[in-house]
Amino acid sequence: MLEDTTIHNAITDKALSSYFRSSGNLLEEESAVLGQAVTNLMLSGDNVNNKNIILSLIHSLETTNDILKADVIRKTLEIVLRYTADDM
């Protein structure tokens, strides 16, 4: 996976990026999930915007069989959606 700085710089929503960056260890698992989603988007050549992050997280949520991982993905999705409400 890419470095945290690269991941945060790739996110077009700077408020969302700042929120995760300033959360420290509080959102460590959620940051890892977000980082994986951003990395996947970057590697596939897609734009790293809230819409694509949301779609990536939904896909991850739909395809995981791990209940604990699904909970972390859901929490990450809720955070991203909170920062996207104005865009809808």
Curated annotation (Swiss-Prot):
<comment type="similarity">
    <text>Belongs to the AriR family.</text>
</comment>
<protein>
    <recommendedName>
        <fullName>Regulatory protein AriR</fullName>
    </recommendedName>
</protein>
<keyword id="KW-0238">DNA-binding</keyword>
<dbReference type="Pfam" id="PF10798">
    <property type="entry name" value="YmgB"/>
</dbReference>
<dbReference type="GO" id="GO:0071468">
    <property type="term" value="P:cellular response to acidic pH"/>
</dbReference>
<comment type="subunit">
    <text>Homodimer.</text>
</comment>
<dbReference type="GO" id="GO:0003677">
    <property type="term" value="F:DNA binding"/>
</dbReference>
<dbReference type="InterPro" id="IPR024753">
    <property type="entry name" value="AriR"/>
</dbReference>
<comment type="function">
    <text>Regulates expression of genes involved in acid-resistance and biofilm formation. May be a non-specific DNA-binding protein that binds genes and/or intergenic regions via a geometric recognition.</text>
</comment>
